[in-house]
């Protein structure tokens, strides 16, 4: 069979014959991950049909591959803990990591991923993609599957296709643990201040909070539930609104440590003592919680382990393997420190 002249034209011919992109053909030629076994064989068969013969042998692939990690923002300790876990996992497995940030300064998103950007990642030989607290459209999910990019989502902001692989913590159980601790101290007016109400972790923690209240015979009060953002400023604003209620809470369960920092700031602004006048529980156990005044009681979630698991699972998907679980949830545990105490009698 006659060959098409030129390497670029030949790649076009192979891609057309196999029904895949040129980026996928390039991955097969160079021994890179990110292509299923079935697709890899289809490309090889197309190469035989069009008479393609590489002029050079395949390049030595990286031991594991290169993974793109996309963060919504890196301006909070949570993201840095997850990144630390991803990097540790990459070092253990011999992979490489490239990071992208959608909101570099924590403000409005400046660069949505989009299918075209995903095409560029595939062409650059990325084995897969890890998204941390970021949103995906159906079009972007389809593009990842089409390009053979292993895709794992850590703490998704929005409910996703059940077929997607996600990594998180036992948020519901953590919400129960935090609220039960406050109830055991005698609190009954317990506020919940969290991030975006569409956030999967925020909703799961809310459900745990409500479950603990109802199990204790305490009727959940919608006035005590606030959503805004996982940020200190938002935590301060939400707490001020809670403290302005006719019957303010004696304790606040913050949906993240960053929010808890804002809760503490609001308490200082009102000259309220923590925990004498207001008890506070955070969620994450990020660095700095031991150094607040007082040290913050918080729900520990294994953020570094979440990063490690996400990296390992992405590489599994890139190799065409079935992951151990489609929805990984790592255990949380309550760490009692100095920011919680029985409520003051009024």
Where are the regions a protein language model picked out?
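Short acidic capping loops at alpha-helix termini that bridge into adjacent secondary structure
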Residues: 188-189, 220-224, 274-279
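N-terminal helix-turn-helix DNA-binding module of bacterial transcription factors
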Residues: 1-63, 344-346
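Alpha-helical recognition/docking segments in bacterial nutrient-uptake
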Residues: 1-6, 65-180
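Periplasmic-binding protein-like
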Residues: 123-133, 191-193, 225, 246-256, ...
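Hinge/beta->alpha junction and helix N-cap segments in small-molecule ligand-binding domains
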Residues: 38, 72-81, 99-112, 156, ...
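Flexible loop/turn connectors
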Residues: 4, 241, 245-346
């Amino acid at each position: 069979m006659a060959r098409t002249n030129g390497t670029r034209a030949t790649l076009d011919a192979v891609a057309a014959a196999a029904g895949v992109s040129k980026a996928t053909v390039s991955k097969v030629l160079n021994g890179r991950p990110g292509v299923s076994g079935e697709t890899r064989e289809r490309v090889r068969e197309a190469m035989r049909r069009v008479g393609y013969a590489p002029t050079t042998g395949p390049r030595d692939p990286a031991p594991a591959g290169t993974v793109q990690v996309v963060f919504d923002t890196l301006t909070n300790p949570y993201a840095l803990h997850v990144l630390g876990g991803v990097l540790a996992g990459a070092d253990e497995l011999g992979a490489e990591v490239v990071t992208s940030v959608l909101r570099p300064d924590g403000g409005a998103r400046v660069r949505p991923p989009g299918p075209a950007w995903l095409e560029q990642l595939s062409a650059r030989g990325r084995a897969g993609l890890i998204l941390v607290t970021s949103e995906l459209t159906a079009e972007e999910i389809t593009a990842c599957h089409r390009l053979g990019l292993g895709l794992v989502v850590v703490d998704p902001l929005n409910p996703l296709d059940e077929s997607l692989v996600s990594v998180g913590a036992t948020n519901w159980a953590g919400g129960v643990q935090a609220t039960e601790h406050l109830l055991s101290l005698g609190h009954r007016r317990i506020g919940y201040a969290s991030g975006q109400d569409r956030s999967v972790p925020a909703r799961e923690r809310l459900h745990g909070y409500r479950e603990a209240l109802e199990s204790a015979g305490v009727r959940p009060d919608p006035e005590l539930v606030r959503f805004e953002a996982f940020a200190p400023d938002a935590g301060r604003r939400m707490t001020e609104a809670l403290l302005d209620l006719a019957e303010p809470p004696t304790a606040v369960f913050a949906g993240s440590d960053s929010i808890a920092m804002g809760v503490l700031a609001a308490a200082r602004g009102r000259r309220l003592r923590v925990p004498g006048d207001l008890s506070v529980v955070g969620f994450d156990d990020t660095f700095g919680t031991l150094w607040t005044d007082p040290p913050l009681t918080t729900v520990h979630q294994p953020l570094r382990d979440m990063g490690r698991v996400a990296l390992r699972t992405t590489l599994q998907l890139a190799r065409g393997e079935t992951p151990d679980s489609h929805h990984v949830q790592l255990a949380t545990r309550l760490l009692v420190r100095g920011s919680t105490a029985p409520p003051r009698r009024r």
